[in-house]
């Protein structure tokens, strides 16, 4: 595991996390190599790495929920989920520098990221 910091950028959907992602990306922070393409609802882009979004979506689906309604029930992450998180982090660490991840869904999984990344984790919460 790398010692480089990891910036976790998250906030509620439509809270300007993409605008912050845009600023950070333009400043040189690597937010992923497979960013979701711009769309009419977000013309400059989402700055979300598709593998991370897919991973988070699968975790939600396996907990019988989605990003639109998570409810107040606990999200249970299995060893398989943690293994996929470790694999994602290892892949991103391979770039050899600090990197970031942006996904509103990530706010539901902060304890898992904090536990795995430890002191490397840096958090930027966007509230609007």
Where are these regions (language model features)?
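Catalytic phosphate/metal-binding cores of nucleic-acid and nucleotide-processing enzymes, i.e., regions
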Residues: 5, 77, 90-97, 116-117, ...
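Charged/polar, solvent-exposed surface patches and flexible loops
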Residues: 54-58, 87, 91, 115
């Amino acid at each position: 595991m790398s010692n480089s910091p990891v910036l976790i950028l998250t906030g509620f959907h439509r809270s300007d996390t993409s605008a912050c992602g845009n600023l950070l990306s333009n400043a040189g922070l690597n937010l992923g190599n497979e960013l979701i393409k711009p769309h009419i609802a977000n013309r400059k882009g989402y700055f979300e790495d598709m593998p991370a979004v897919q991973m988070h979506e699968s975790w939600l689906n396996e907990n019988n929920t989605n990003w639109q309604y998570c409810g107040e029930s606990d999200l249970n992450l299995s060893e398989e989920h943690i293994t996929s998180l470790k694999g994602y982090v290892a892949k991103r660490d391979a770039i050899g520098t600090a990197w970031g991840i942006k996904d509103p869904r990530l706010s539901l999984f902060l304890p898992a990221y904090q536990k795995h990344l430890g002191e490397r984790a840096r958090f930027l919460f966007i509230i609007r």
